[in-house]
Amino acid sequence: MRWLLPWTLAAVAVLRVGNILATALSPTPTTMTFTPAPLEETTTRPEFCKWPCECPQSPPRCPLGVSLITDGCECCKICAQQLGDNCTEAAICDPHRGLYCDYSGDRPRYAIGVCAQVVGVGCVLDGVRYTNGESFQPNCRYNCTCIDGTVGCTPLCLSPRPPRLWCRQPRHVRVPGQCCEQWVCDDDARRPRQTALLDTRAFAASGAVEQRYENCIAYTSPWSPCSTTCGLGISTRISNVNARCWPEQESRLCNLRPCDVDIQLHIKAGKKCLAVYQPEEATNFTLAGCVSTRTYRPKYCGVCTDNRCCIPYKSKTISVDFQCPEGPGFSRQVLWINACFCNLSCRNPNDIFADLESYPDFEEIAN
């Protein structure tokens, strides 16, 4: 039996070698490799700005109420895109209406958007929540507005100053049945009271009103500072000089200085200020695509190289007639500067809450 063992081992070895050769010589199955088709390039942003700038010879005429601004390429004048219009890096939204370009609908390029309204933060006053831009009256003496998380209030009682010098003993008292306090003048009976009376009989004679409002104390507040330090802005005041003797808000356009002129270049050598700047040529006023019917050569307040600021010192209000390319014309009241002076008493005219320091504190407004 010993001779059988070597033959058995040899047979097993031959079988193993045969299996290995069969595996090595058998054909290998082919593996299919999938190559995806090239995708369309959707992340490439189109070029809306071209350099050098190519602008038309004359700026476009914008519809009434649409601002004429410089495009996003800082090249040409365009009519600003309005709410709901498409916008790009060149065709920008109207900044004077608080609009911005929302690119969220153009992912992933973020090239073409839609003009949307800026949504601000609401306010909370005395436990009551108000939305951004909402106006409200916490009491009968104040009218407040919520502006992006901050509450600004203006007084409704138009008696900020005591009577004039003819009143020797003025007193600020509460009148039963009325919200606002009033000045009472305990004058000497021998001294007649000389009030500034507005007799509206002239209005009645012209047919403007049906009833007479005699013994109306005329009141006109000073004009507020211009809403912008350069360029076109708005100034307001309160006046009851009307047929009803009712306090109404009046507004006028104002332009303290041009934004596109470097006034510092006109300051004389050795000087630190230029109080008044006046352009050499007369030009037309423009407003929302409409042009004034005549040319003007206005004076502007200048600038200083130190910490002083220049504000109007002598001014008046003029009426300017505008003519629109399509539609009827209109007229607006405009600030006309005669003289300016420069001092260190400066404040930002855009700070609508600066006057609140002279008003009662928060507790009085909230209560």
From Swiss-Prot:
Per the UniProt annotation, where are the glycans attached?
Answer: N86, N143, N284, N343
Task: List, for all copies, the residue spans of the domain called TSP type-1.
Answer: 215-260
Concerning SMART domains, the annotation shows: CT, IB, TSP1, VWC
Q: Which residues form the IGFBP N-terminal domain?
A: 45-118
Q: What are the record keywords, sorted?
A: Cell adhesion, Disulfide bond, Glycoprotein, Proto-oncogene, Secreted, Signal, Wnt signaling pathway
The alphabetized list of GO BP terms reads: bone development; cell adhesion; glucose homeostasis; negative regulation of chondrocyte differentiation; negative regulation of fat cell differentiation; osteoblast differentiation; osteoclast differentiation; positive regulation of inflammatory response
Please give the tissue specificity annotation from the record for this chain: Highly expressed in kidney and lung. Lower levels in heart, brain, spleen, liver, skeletal muscle and testis. Expressed in low metastatic melanoma cells.
> What Pfam family is a match, any one?
Cys_knot
What cellular-component terms does GO give this entry?
cytoplasm; cytosol; extracellular space
Q: Which Gene3D superfamilies match?
A: Complement Module, domain 1, Thrombospondin type-1 (TSP1) repeat
Q: Where in the cell is it found?
A: Secreted
**Looking at the record's lineage, which domain of life comes first?**
Eukaryota
Signal peptide as annotated in the record: 1-22
Report domain VWFC positions.
121-186
Kindly list the cysteine pairs connected by disulfide bridges.
C49-C73, C53-C75, C55-C76, C62-C79, C87-C101, C93-C115, C273-C310, C290-C324, C301-C340, C304-C342, C309-C346
Keyword Disulfide bond carried by entry: yes
Q: Which residues form the CTCK domain?
A: 273-347
- What function is annotated for this protein? Downstream regulator in the Wnt/Frizzled-signaling pathway. Associated with cell survival. Adheres to skin and melanoma fibroblasts. In vitro binding to skin fibroblasts occurs through the proteoglycans, decorin and biglycan. Suppresses tumor growth in vivo.
Q: Which family does it belong to?
A: Belongs to the CCN family.
Give the protein's recorded name: CCN family member 4
